[in-house]
Design a protein with these regions (language model features):
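Phosphate- and other anionic-substrate recognition elements at nucleic-acid/protein interfaces
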Residues: 1-157
Length: 157
């Protein structure tokens, strides 16, 4: 049987003045997912590749299992930012909405605070520029990880 997903972990240097608390950013995707965890002096990124599934229930279960696999040992309350819809995109919006809902439900079950923010709002908060994309700033990171990092930073500032 083909594996359902592959997770690559990246630990990067912490920023100056790291925020106090646990902040999680998620760039949802139907095939590629980025997850970022900001915690004390750690910045941990996960680049996830998911096998495409036609079954929405399987996709939602996979999303929750992936989140639990990446974020399993934090006992603290967290704020989770899930990147919302980009209104210019037309493809796979239903599947992306299911991913967002499933990830939000995962976080709510852990009593985490959940925010779903549009990409422009995240960019304005983090970069003071709604057009500047995360992968244009952090060129050394996978695009999904860079987007997830900007999500986590958006709710930490």
């Amino acid at each position: 049987m083909k594996e359902k997903w592959k997770i690559e972990r990246f630990d990067i240097e912490p920023f100056d003045n790291m925020p106090k608390g646990l902040f999680i950013g998620v760039d949802p995707g139907t095939v590629h997912l980025g997850i970022c965890v900001l915690w004390e002096t750690q910045v941990t990124l996960y680049q996830v590749s998911i096998a495409r599934s036609a079954n929405p229930i399987n996709r939602m279960q996979d999303a929750q299992q992936i989140m639990s696999e990446c974020i399993h040992n934090y006992l603290h309350s967290a704020t989770v930012c899930i990147e919302g819809a980009s209104f210019a995109d037309k493809y796979r919006q239903v599947e992306l909405a299911e991913m967002r809902a499933s990830i939000a439900w995962w976080g709510l079950n852990k009593k985490f605070r959940i925010e779903i923010l549009p990409p422009n709002s995240i960019r304005k908060i983090v970069f003071n520029n709604g057009k500047l994309k995360a992968h244009e700033v952090w060129t050394n990171l996978p695009h999904d990880c860079a987007a997830a990092l900007s999500c986590a930073l958006a709710v930490s500032l």
